[in-house]
């Protein structure tokens, strides 16, 4: 009879412990319900990138001296620099400059070590295409400045600094973002 009583006591203690664990996990879940949403509606809302963001590379053809430093510091020898030696002036003349963004790892070494600052990183990150050969940008495509996300009136920009206000009087299933 005595082992049966201790068995019931152990069962009761285990039941109380399980109920406490369930209650703790439920309280954690409820504490997360008060947080603001983290996700954004991507095509219509875009986060503003930071200053140090490494996006598509912008190239200025007139500043380049064809020194090929960018090729030497690139971990995968990616930039293709075609030049010829102009015998009259004894200088290199740049003919073609291209980067394949399908292979580029966006490390930023080429931008950092360029002596003439003809390379710079932009905030453009939407480089997806259906054909991988379209990711090979020549000096004309690299020279185009991307449209800034801030200047595009069709896109609502959001930052991590401004909190999004959520209507409190609506039920949880139909929360809407208010300005």
From Swiss-Prot:
Pfam families reported in the protein's UniProt record: Fer4_10
Keywords tagged on the record: 4Fe-4S, Chloroplast, Iron, Iron-sulfur, Membrane, Metal-binding, NAD, NADP, Plastid, Plastoquinone, Quinone, Repeat, Thylakoid, Translocase
Protein name: NAD(P)H-quinone oxidoreductase subunit I, chloroplastic
UniProt binding sites for [4Fe-4S] cluster 2: 74, 104, 107, 110
Membrane topology of this protein: Peripheral membrane protein
EC number: 7.1.1.-
PANTHER family: NAD(P)H-QUINONE OXIDOREDUCTASE SUBUNIT I, CHLOROPLASTIC
Cofactor detail note: Binds 2 [4Fe-4S] clusters per subunit.
Function: NDH shuttles electrons from NAD(P)H:plastoquinone, via FMN and iron-sulfur (Fe-S) centers, to quinones in the photosynthetic chain and possibly in a chloroplast respiratory chain. The immediate electron acceptor for the enzyme in this species is believed to be plastoquinone. Couples the redox reaction to proton translocation, and thus conserves the redox energy in a proton gradient.
One of the protein's GO biological processes: photosynthesis, light reaction
Keyword Lipid metabolism: no
Signal peptide bounds: none
Amino-acid positions noted as binding [4Fe-4S] cluster 1 in the UniProt annotation, renumbered to this chain: 64, 67, 70, 114
Cofactor annotation: [4Fe-4S] cluster
Cited SUPFAM superfamilies: 4Fe-4S ferredoxins (SSF54862)
4Fe-4S ferredoxin-type domain segment(s): 55-84, 95-124
Similarity field: Belongs to the complex I 23 kDa subunit family.
GO CC, alphabetical: chloroplast thylakoid membrane
Subcellular location(s) of the protein: Plastid, Chloroplast thylakoid membrane
An MF annotation (GO) of this entry: iron ion binding
Catalytic activity: a plastoquinone + NADH + (n+1) H(+)(in) = a plastoquinol + NAD(+) + n H(+)(out); a plastoquinone + NADPH + (n+1) H(+)(in) = a plastoquinol + NADP(+) + n H(+)(out)
Top EC class for this record: translocase
Assembly information from the UniProt record: NDH is composed of at least 16 different subunits, 5 of which are encoded in the nucleus.
InterPro entries: 4Fe4S_Fe-S-bd, 4Fe4S_Fe_S_CS, NADH_quinone_OxRdtase_chainI, NDHI
The species this protein was found in: Acorus calamus
């Amino acid at each position: 009879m005595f082992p049966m009583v201790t068995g019931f006591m152990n069962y009761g203690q285990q039941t109380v412990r399980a109920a406490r664990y369930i209650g703790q996990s439920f309280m954690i879940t409820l504490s997360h319900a008060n947080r603001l949403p983290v996700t954004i509606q991507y095509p219509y809302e875009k986060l503003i990138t930071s200053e140090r963001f490494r996006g598509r590379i912008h190239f200025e053809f007139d500043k380049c001296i064809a020194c090929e430093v960018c090729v030497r510091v690139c971990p995968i020898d990616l930039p293709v620099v075609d030049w010829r030696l102009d015998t009259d002036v004894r200088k290199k003349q740049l003919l073609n400059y291209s980067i394949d963004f399908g292979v580029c790892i966006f490390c930023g070494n080429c931008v950092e070590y360029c002596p003439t600052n003809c390379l710079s990183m932009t905030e453009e990150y939407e480089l997806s295409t259906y054909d991988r050969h379209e990711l090979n940008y020549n000096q004309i495509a690299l020279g185009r400045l991307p449209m800034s996300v801030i200047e595009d009136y069709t896109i609502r920009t959001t930052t991590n600094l401004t909190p999004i206000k959520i209507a409190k009087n609506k039920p949880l299933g139909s929360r809407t973002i208010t300005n």
